[in-house]
């Protein structure tokens, strides 16, 4: 096997997402063909997904409850242990590219105003990621909080999940609102692994909330045995250190398909979860809800 590329647009993301995931995988392959390592490929794929306004990352990210703020998280990791992340970065087009620059510093994670200032110093232009769709999602969230929306009459599994999740974790009913992550895992021809992820977080969140993505071992992890990227409710993923847990199973010799299935099974059915896994013996995509994804193996 010369390469393995897996991409996803987030568990419960729109059904129209697979073609964008395929284009992201193509961008990753282009990075490999240009001589880049696995890390460059994972970053390229994730940046493409950030640019698709249907996904909750980069352009199209969820507004916070204040209706003004978009705070984005992103992270990248290579199998040699290099890691870089940003949390609550604002008004940049591609947070994953800023995270990649953090990886080149002595730091692991930059947050808030410091992360945004870092991006500006490196020449990342100011970019407004707000879309009309994000404003509509925010309006539905406020209606649910006021009690004049989200009556629970949902007609599909994803909608029912969001209604249950809102009641379980935020104590109110709500219309379906995606609050997930985009990401990629890659193995290159030299056996190097990498993972990358990006998210706009949840509308049902206070300003300053940080999810799983920028926490090493929670949303992503990569090492000499493989790479893992997760998507779902960030707090629940972080509590279980999902990516590192699945990676440790790979290191113990568990097959990627089995490791991915076990990772999803760590969560009760009410919590939507998905993982991408690539190891030395193969690759796997697993989720308990719809999750647009793509893979290239060559």
Language-model features: locations:
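Alpha/propeptide regions of enzymes that mature by internal proteolysis
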Residues: 1-298
């Amino acid at each position: 096997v010369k390469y393995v590329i897996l991409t996803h647009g987030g568990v419960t993301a729109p059904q129209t997402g697979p073609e964008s995931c395929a284009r992201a995988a193509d961008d990753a392959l282009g990075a490999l063909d240009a001589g880049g390592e696995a890390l460059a490929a994972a970053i390229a794929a994730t940046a493409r997904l950030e640019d698709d306004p249907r996904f909750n990352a980069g352009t199209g990210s969820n507004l916070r409850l204040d209706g003004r703020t978009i705070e984005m998280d992103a992270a990248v990791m290579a199998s040699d242990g290099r890691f870089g992340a940003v949390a609550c970065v604002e008004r940049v087009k591609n947070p994953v590219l800023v995270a990649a620059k953090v990886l080149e510093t002595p730091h692991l994670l930059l947050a808030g105003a410091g992360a945004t200032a870092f991006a500006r110093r490196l020449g990342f232009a100011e970019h407004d990621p707000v879309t009309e769709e994000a404003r509509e999602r925010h309006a539905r969230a406020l209606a649910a909080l006021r009690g004049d929306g989200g009556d629970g009459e949902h007609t599909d599994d994803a909608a029912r999940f969001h209604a249950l999740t809102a009641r379980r974790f935020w104590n109110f009913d709500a219309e379906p609102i995606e609050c997930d992550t985009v990401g990629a895992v890659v193995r290159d021809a030299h056996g190097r692994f990498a993972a990358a992820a990006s998210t706009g977080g949840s509308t049902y969140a206070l300003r300053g909330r940080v999810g799983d993505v920028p926490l090493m071992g929670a949303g992503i992890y990569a090492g000499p045995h493989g790479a893992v990227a997760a998507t779902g409710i960030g707090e629940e993923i972080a509590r279980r250190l999902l990516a590192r847990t699945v990676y440790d199973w790979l290191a113990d010799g568990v097959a990627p398909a089995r490791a991915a299935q076990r990772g999803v099974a760590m969560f009760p059915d009410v919590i939507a979860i998905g993982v991408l896994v690539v190891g030395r013996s193969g690759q796997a995509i697993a989720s308990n809800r719809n999750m647009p994804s793509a893979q290239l193996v060559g």
